[in-house]
Amino acid sequence: MRTPHAIVLGGGGLLGEAWMSALLAGLEDSKEFDARRSACYVGTSAGSIVAASLAAGLEPGARLGRLPDLAVPSADGSEERETAFSSAFAAAAKLAGAAATPLAPLAFASTAAGGAMLRRAALRGIPEGRRSLEELGRQVELSGVSWDGRLRIVAVERESGRRVVFGAPGAPDVPVSSAVQASCAIPGYFRPVKAHGRTYVDGGLWSPTNIDVAEVDGGQHVLCLNPTGALRPASRALTGAIGTFSRAVTSAEALLLKNRGAIVTTINPDAHSAAAMGGNLMDARPRQAVIEAGLAQGRRLAAEEQRSAA
């Protein structure tokens, strides 16, 4: 696989971040693929961490030994973490109806005004989170990343329910570290980011990947990694509905880019990666297994590309 013009990195909690970093590291087995040379990065929630590290010039594998400050593994806290993670998608999941009504999430994402109203209403019912993401912000600052024109970080403005794309022209002026914290601020669990009199929370509330933010022209390649695309209806009702929502919305947004002539490749976790991830993407315990599965998936994809090009 050649280096794409744009890399889009979706939400997916602790394990999604690990899978994306590992998969990109595996893809770099291909001599023509260098994730640090793309012209555009779009990061949502956990994907904002990976996007910022790539924009900083760090190799994808550089993050595999580090645990981002998103969760503290403990046996008695897993249910609380899962509930907090799921709440960010609850409104969309209810509309998806656990795959019974596949067109509902498309309507939810594509009608900006209606979608913003639904998000605003849902956020009103969720108390502000208390856990800090300041350590994550410090990690981002230490990477030396800056707004160099390539990076886009997605969050949602809590007051209006609308999407905000930090790094884009006209967006609020905040440091990259603050933008990443905002994009990762799962409502009800993490403390939201406040800037310029507004409050910002997890960008995954708008879309699992926000692939339509990618700035591309006809013929340019967009690579989208969607960690939540592997959550299936066969699992518990809510996580299955999240997976349905994730795949449907990402497909709808990708179609917008394809209509502009872009070439879009979306990668979801394969069967081995999905099995390693399970249904709780904030549980740190299977992280090493997810890394190994992601690396293997990336290397397999790189090998397949090399064989097809031969």
Predicted regions and their residues:
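Patatin-like phospholipase
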Residues: 1-44, 49-310
